[in-house]
């Protein structure tokens, strides 16, 4: 019985260690409210593989994460733990980042774009080299006490009780298209929390901001005449679209990728925001500092890039196309 218990405990410990090192100790979907990246977790096949191993040392070596970043963190962790004067928060920070690197995320391939939300930065990698890098603005942090406040809102249904949560979700997708001079379909949440009040305070706000108002799919000819006091924010029957142009909140470029959160990368008409240290200020989408440079990297074709430039009233790089540009202007 003692030997049997020892065998069971050893097997259980080996399985737990394998899962911890190979998959991570935490399921990120349980940690983050807006985590939409597919993550591989332990299953019966992984357990069977551990139990059937004939070389434990080989197994322990094979499950160690091999990424250069992980190995750097391993070295740093050993160094800080050996130094009695090291600050505990540094050890904790390293351990948290090692845990993130254990999560089995989808293969990114040789070329990919990474938006680092805490760092407010975007980097385009190719074969581990950096093609381009720029600042970004991301979604604002959720309101303090959000969990309790959202419960209150769900009970009351009163928008005044609704707490703010504009955090940019964590997701994985593929960039598939560029929209030039985009129209902004204003989300219901922004219409209720911002557009409604702006229109109440200033009857000409909508027309001055190039915002069109629609009712049951039809555009209202004179939105300045709408009597907003007749409508509640909770049951606002209108849809709002901001036309393309200099004042458009999306700027001149919108970069689209599939996701269930209506998130995209885009230009902005508020360039001063990139001078701020804390750039968690958007409603969730990601504003990019250098949209033209990002577009050039994305299309990878000089002719297409010149087409994009001319669509936003910029001269083409190819001087042979200047006649086309002047005619367009």
Regions flagged by a language model, labelled:
Residues 8, 12-16, 20, 28-35, ...:
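Well-ordered beta-sheet/strand-loop patches within structured domains
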